[in-house]
Amino acid sequence: GEHTRSGDAMLLINPHTTFYFRPEIHVVSDEGLNAYGAVTWGQFFVYQGFNERTGWMHTSTYVDFLDEFIEDVSTRDGRRVYRYGNELRDVTTQTVTLRYRTTTGMAEREFETYRTHHGPITHAIDGKWVATRINWKPAEALAQSFVRTKQRDHAGFRAMMQRRTNSSNNTVYADADGTIAYYHGNFIPRRDPQFDYSKPVDGSDPRTDWQGIHEVDETVNVVNPTIGWLQNCNSTPFTSAGPDSPKREDYPVYMAPDPENFRGVHAQRVLEGVSDLTLEGLIALAYDDKLPGFETLLGGLVSAWDDTGRDDAPYAQAIDLLRNWDHRTRANSVEMTLAHHYGMQFKKHGTYPGTLRGMALIEFLGTGSVTQERVATFERTVDELTRDFGRWDIPWGDVNRFQRLTGDLALRYDDEAPSLPVGLASGDWGALASFRARRGNGSKRIYGVSGNSFVAVVEFGDRVRAKSLLAGGQSGDPDSPHFDDQAQRYVDGAFKDVPFYRDEVEARAVSRYRPGLSD
């Protein structure tokens, strides 16, 4: 809270997910449950959210929590066995019956399944069976997810984390006591570091076996860093708290192989030197429109163009726009249209090592690619924009749109149907407020499909205070008034106040329902 006007801790909750996948929920019981936030379909616990005293946000992790073991399988006396050290162990066989529906009624089919002590046989590599091992404690994982929502302080939250069944997430935490914390992963098997577990390992060698699960204290985490802030954007934990971040050399590679990305770079920039922060100020940081991914990418393009000595229209005019651009995305920005389509064109058709992803790929396209290819790709970008829209200098909001036509899972888009201009951009370029858009159903425009979905900012004072936003609306029914009633708010970044306490909820109630009763 040292950087906030109130002195209280604040939390930004912004999972970048598929639109309409995380409805906004408030669950309350007389047994002490009072949690608000986002849930994935079917979950009865608040996945990313807050209660009166604690808040939690998950990002996706690259922690290696799954391994593949190549098994040495043979047949002895009519039995399938596999080698483990000097032993031959039986392969476990189980018959699974699956019932399914056909046009004439129900049918069933039997499958033989196989497993070793490592786990089920899932596939083969070069003719050798491979067993896959993961965290398979679904009941315990479900319990941890629910217990998380009822914690009152960091001691309880850390005890919950010690259950160690959360495989796929990192966790950012804040509470009413002023504690902030970051946990990189949770379920992390202990392994022999001499082996490379990013690839399948030899299952016949006992040394490759898991050696238990790391304690929470052994994992990468940060609690109350001196700098006073924490961030993670599906990125490396080694920049999560500026100079107070954990050190890479203190941990095994499998514990944090996550690369840096442009959103992580952007988050660090906006947090450095922050002070006197309010909830509204936190929203402003979260919607900062700078896109660091274009700094190197477009710098390399402009340099390559200058090397040609050319000044022919319309390409020279387009290059000059990018040369003088501040790399900020806005709905009226022609530069953003050019930059996005150039980057996407280069990623789709460019020549680069196939192993490159994310930030490393963008940096290569900016500085490591063939200069003639940069120029040719940009020319093709300008030509295609002219073909599709009748001009190349088209504002970003005319191309980048928000549209919700149906409640179908498979979203469809229509250039002739109503839609809203959006000034946000993809997280690929470093946008903290991400809006990933693509074409669909033969459209020329691009339409948002994922990114900012449920977003909330929370301040943990004497009374918790929060603001939130949801892509489109809460309902999946096009006939509901809540199908797209938040669409304009979403586009504008105009957050609504969250009614958390009972008096706030009752003051805004439109209707009430109890089973068998309504008013």
Language-model regions: role of each:
Residues 1-315, 321-324, 328-331, 445-519:
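Mature extracytoplasmic enzyme cores
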Residues 136, 140, 210, 246, ...:
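Generic signal for short, ordered secondary-structure residues
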Residues 181-188, 290, 294-295, 306-310, ...:
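Short amphipathic alpha-helical patches
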Residues 195-197, 311-411:
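A terminal-accessory region detector
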Residues 385-495:
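C-terminal accessory/interaction regions of large nucleic acid-associated machines
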